[in-house]
Amino acid sequence: QVYPQGRGMDDTEKSWTIDGVTFKHVSQEELKFVYNNIESDLNRVTQKASADWIPADIYAAVRSGSTQLYLAFKDNYYAGFFVLTPLNSVTGEKTLYIWVAYSKPEYNIWEAGIQFLDNLIQGTSITGMEFHSDRSGWSRAAKKHGFKAVTTVYRKEV
């Protein structure tokens, strides 16, 4: 169950707690203060996966308002983050694109993170979630959380 934080606090603060993990929305104004803390983790993600983006792309997308950043905290310690972009298909269907999901190795926020994402889109016009990965281990984890493979992309650089 999702418990919004901040009772008695500023209503503009968006945060939710699930199974001891708090997910906090980072506003465009807060981004410049938060970015230095996540930039090294964004670099880790690009090194592990063949990402077609660089950390500065994330900063620009969140700053523009087209993308949302949520930080995760466990026991009041930074545990990871989600970078999310709502997408519209040509048919008008809306999808939540999980651009980047990161959990610090010493924390396991995936169960709470998927539950957070499920609850985040409830009551919206978003009909599904998707992410891309070239890492084969994600096929097992994705299936466990209700995701299914839709397509496989192969690329050859020329």
Residue spans for each PLM region:
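Short amphipathic alpha-helix that is part of the acyltransferase structural core
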Residues: 3-53
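Active-site/acyl-donor-binding loops of N-acyltransferases
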Residues: 4, 10, 131-158
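Active-site rim helix/loop that mediates acceptor-substrate recognition in acyltransferases
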Residues: 48-67
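Conserved donor-binding loop and adjoining core beta-sheet/short helix segment
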Residues: 64-107
